[in-house]
């Protein structure tokens, strides 16, 4: 399964690990995904993966 938010499509980013000697190694920065249940229009529930930042926005009601 892709490490991607089901609503905002946020996915992994690429960055660097930087040591004290200023050596740089590539790393992946993964989104903070949470599994939630969402109720569909027909009354059934579905489990989706949503980023924590998206979840905060949903709870604010924006």
Swiss-Prot record:
InterPro entries: Bacterial_rp_bL28 (IPR050096), Ribosomal_bL28 (IPR026569), Ribosomal_bL28/bL31-like_sf (IPR034704), Ribosomal_bL28_bact-type (IPR001383), Ribosomal_bL28_sf (IPR037147). One of its GO terms (cellular component) is ribosome. GO terms for biological process: translation. Keywords: Ribonucleoprotein, Ribosomal protein. One of its GO terms (molecular function) is structural constituent of ribosome. SUPFAM superfamilies: L28p-like. Belongs to the bacterial ribosomal protein bL28 family. HAMAP family: Ribosomal_bL28. This is Large ribosomal subunit protein bL28. It comes from Helicobacter pylori (strain G27). The gene is rpmB.
């Amino acid at each position: 399964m892709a490490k991607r938010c089901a609503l905002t499509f946020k996915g992994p980013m690429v960055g660097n690990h930087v040591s004290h000697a200023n050596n740089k190694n590539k790393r992946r920065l993964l989104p903070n995904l949470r599994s939630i249940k969402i109720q569909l229009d027909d009354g059934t529930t579905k489990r989706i993966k949503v980023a924590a930042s998206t979840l905060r926005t949903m709870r604010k009601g924006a």
